[in-house]
UniProtKB/Swiss-Prot annotation:
EC numbers: 2.1.1.197
Enzyme class of the recorded protein, top EC level: transferase
Pfam families: Methyltransf_11 (PF08241)
Alphabetically ordered keywords of this record: Biotin biosynthesis, Methyltransferase, S-adenosyl-L-methionine, Transferase
UniProt protein name: Malonyl-[acyl-carrier protein] O-methyltransferase
Similarity annotation: Belongs to the methyltransferase superfamily.
Top-level taxon: Bacteria
Lineage summary: Bacteria, Pseudomonadati, Deferribacterota, Deferribacteres, Deferribacterales
Length: 245
């Protein structure tokens, strides 16, 4: 995964109270799971579990025998009831087979998405499911327009194309969510406390900061200063055999 994900430990204590969109995405994803694939699964894996925001929904909504959680480090504040797989999901070995794999607001950090889904395909049991959310190309577009810094997001159709090579598409959905802040400074604080962008890697001078705040005035509305999120939702099933070259 991209190196910015390594900095999550700095914001972990503040994440859940500030990750308003990610929480909404988690709840919506679980609704789609309940509607489309049910809640009975033996072996469950969550990729990029972070502080356990989505994990709590799994524990509440899914009937499982074993729960495996993955992230670069263990930020979970509660103990017991899971096996932790520490490391970059693109690099670690997945020796178990899973009935369902979840991930909420993590795959935007992946370097090679197609290689990852090949790996996850092989790690699913027959008829297993991959259910995840991520972000699209218009995510945080206001900040990127000003700074020219941001992640290189895949488009919705690119995700569908990659997924369709290996899985049956069960459900897919995308939308836009808007947050409003009292000032451009509050926009930056929000991004810092949720770790959602790579802007923090840039060395800002005082002039850069002033220029950012002045430029952000173009996104001022009656509700406040606009920040756009672009969530994607996917549920896919492993119901066909794929031949690898």
């Amino acid at each position: 995964m991209l190196t910015s994900k390594n900095n999550f430990h700095k914001v972990a204590p503040f994440y859940e109270q500030n990750a308003l969109i990610q929480k909404k995405m988690a709840e919506r994803l679980m609704e789609l799971v309940e509607k489309n694939v049910g809640c009975e699964f033996d072996d469950v894996l969550e990729i990029g579990c972070g502080t356990g925001l989505f994990t709590k929904l799994i524990q509440k909504k899914i009937n499982y025998n074993r729960l495996f959680l993955n992230d670069l480090h263990n930020f979970i504040s509660f103990e017991g009831g899971y096996d932790f797989l520490e490391g970059d999901i693109e690099e670690i070995n997945l020796s178990d087979k899973f009935d369902i794999i979840f991930s909420n607001a993590t795959f935007q950090w992946v370097k090679d998405f197609e290689q990852l889904i090949q790996k996850l395909y092989q790690s699913l049991k027959p008829q297993g499911y991959l259910c995840f959310t991520t972000f699209g190309e218009e995510n945080l577009k206001e900040v990127k327009r000003i700074t020219n810094v941001g992640l290189n997001y895949l488009t919705f159709n690119e995700y569908l194309d990659f997924l369709g090579r290996y899985f049956k598409i069960v459900a897919h959905y995308h939308t836009k969510e808007c947050l409003y802040f009292q000032s451009p400074v509050d926009v930056l604080k929000h991004m810092k406390l949720t770790g959602v962008n790579s802007v923090e890697k840039v060395q800002w001078t005082k002039r850069d900061f002033v220029n950012f705040c002045e430029s952000y005035e173009q996104f001022k509305t009656e509700e406040g200063y606009l920040l756009t999120y672009h969530p994607f939702y996917f549920i896919v099933s492993k119901n066909k055999e794929v031949c690898y070259d």
